[in-house]
Amino acid sequence: MADTFGQSGPISEADAIGRWSLAFAKVAPPLLFGLRLWAAVCLALFVAFWLELDNPFWAGTSAAIVCQAQLGASLRKGWFRMIGTVVGATMIVVLTACFPQDRIAFLALLAVWCGLCAFAATVFRNFASYSAALAGYTAAIIAADNLGATGGASSDVFLLAVTRASEICIGIACAGIVLAGTDLGGAQRRLAESFASLAAEIMGQFVRMLGLPEAQLPDTKAGRREFVRRVIALDPVIDQALGESSHVRYHSPNLQTAMYGLFAALDGWRGVATHLGRLSEAAGRQGAHIILQSLPAELRSVLEADSPLLWIADPLALHRVCKQAVHTLIALPADTPSLRLLADEAAKVLAGMLHVLDGLALLVDAPGQPSPDTRGFRLGEPDWLPALINAARAFLAIGAVELFWVATAWPTGVAAIVIVAILILLLSPKGDLAYGGSLVFALGTAGAVICAAAVKFAMLPALQTFPALCAALAVFFLPAGFAMAVSRQPVATVALTAMTVNFNVLLAPINEMNYDTAQYYNSVLAIMVGCSVAPLAFSLFPPLSPAFRIRRFLALTSRDLRRLAVAALLPAPHDWESRIYSRLIALPDQATPLQRAQLLAALSVGAEIIGLRQMATQLGTTAELDAALNDVALGHSSNAIAKLRQFDDRLAATPEPEATMALRGRGRVLIISEAIAEHGHYFDTGAPA
């Protein structure tokens, strides 16, 4: 029986219940996040009040900062926040001990320390970057509580540092307890699904390319370049998974290697696709058919299915089949450099997938998973210039506010130093987003001022118990947390984050509340001044634009490749790959697909040059190879390709037993020549005159 009517007719009771259930399922996760945020803040305040700490609101603030929509992100952030807190508290004690009576030296070195933390926050990634920033502004927070009207350290700094660090760590622990008790986590599962989806799509398209006749050979450039972008996006998801599981964290090098295995697979796919596109129709069809038939039938069926579930179901069994295929391709009899290239590059694709399957076995807790890779990949710093600029900006901005505070003897001006330190250190790694982020943060802080004033002066005077305080906090944190979770606009998310972070600081709940409106608005003035200084610093001393950073990454890689071509001492292939991987990961989102492809091509050319030079030493053909690589170093692509052909002729005349090695070298020559021909303009740009 229908008891309600919709626009299209009667709605049954079951349909109405279904719609309500669907609506509740949509709002339940953000509502739960709001409840967790509120509960974490209340628990932190309760513990801090029970311990009778001086400023319990720092515990609540820390709990609000640590809370994230994902459990793994919260736990990972909490762990790194704890490290940064201890480091920052230790440093302020050291500074005070070194300069107990020298106000100028103390303030100057505080600015230097914040500059160093800004440098580290730019160099590190994800939550490690946050930890470095925290080490800087924790020192500023403790210094603010320890300084007088115009500066100068106090002998009580050690106890104060211990107290502040304790308050912050209480907030971290309480947030972790609340979130771990109300969320089973899902980052590990999501990461496994992302890895499996990428692996299945990459291998599915690769096998389909091999199965098509030459006349139907698709242009896979756009697809490969989009895959590069998606692989780069895995980096923060890996960090979240590390926060959820100590077992996964112990095996973290395996996950990094799995990510770089995807890059290696895309590099091998690029080599195969580029070479097939340059062959005649008959030769291309024959080569692709040989490679495809060399794959085990069991592996082909999995790859052609293009199903991520098959990769997750039994990654170790698939690993064994892929490993067998790699050995088959490497040992494949080849009588031409073309076939040797196709076999070796296809083996590179599958070898990359072996690393991915190792990572999947870890993520799905497969029995008999491989032992942890203790080596992993060590990422180098892709570019030191942004870190140096951020360090200089932090030092100058914080130093300028310190001088203004000392000169004016502004009683609450120390709060401006803290806000400037927080914004500069947190936003500097964001690059071109830092200026806009600081403006939005200021707007969010203004909203927190209004909300905190309403709660503090309109509600709290009538409340006497801690449960009543929690009820008052719920009025703010529940809707704010709900809005943060449902927001899909970065601007709104930043503004709401600023509101939740600053609310407790402005409310300042302590055992004996102070309702002095003059003091409140003096503190608000200092905070808003700090919020105004940060955007000014970013506008006067702007970060490198994304376009400039992209050009620098490409120029640095091109320079490194030219140096590699003529280097007296070759780096290990692992070191070269780590350097280029770090630049791929750090590449701004604004990079075009072509620019990502150029970095991937440089990765391939560099690795092949290293292998070819090592091979030439064994074959006694270094003179011919050096002549070709010298033109690579000079940016003369056409001449380099011509001399590589001459070197290929020299290798073709190699007698047994080195003929097999020489044939593999001829395949490497083809890879280098085709990559240089495809991206000749890039490899020639920036060459020495």
Where is each model-derived feature located?
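Active-site segments that bind and position negatively charged phosphate/pyrophosphate groups
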Residues: 591-619
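Hydrophobic N-terminal alpha-helices or hydrophobic patches in metabolic proteins across all domains
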Residues: 224-227, 255, 279, 605
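Generic hydrophobic, helix-prone segments enriched in Leu/Val/Ile
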Residues: 188, 550, 554, 577-584, ...
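Soluble C-terminal extramembrane regulatory/interaction domains of multi-pass membrane proteins
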Residues: 198-216, 255-374, 611-689
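A transmembrane helix-and-boundary motif of multi-pass membrane transporters/channels
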Residues: 1-246, 250, 358-601, 682
